[in-house]
């Protein structure tokens, strides 16, 4: 008798494009989005209002992949719930302030910085990380995320 063990993994990863992806939904809509790989934080409520965000990610991102970051904010005076507010992209397209060299392997983590200033004063915010790529064997990997809401 012979034995065989098989362990298969499939990462749901692709780069949806407006106009070519069927049923495309932009990541800036308040619900949904066409990318299947994303992480959304719980709403974060602040004691004092802020006007800027500074977010850092440690990520291993190969040349065939990308990480995009979106945010949404609301103030005490806003009658809308945070979940009803549309997402806004950091740097207009969700890209990092500056992109480090692509990672060579899954353990080659580099720091990505996303910052946005001159925002209307807000008392709550949420973040969305969208992972895209063309080769599902090499998805972006995120080790940790750090963020600060600033009143500048």
Outline where the language-model segments fall.
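Beta-strand-rich ligand- or partner-binding modules
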Residues: 1-152
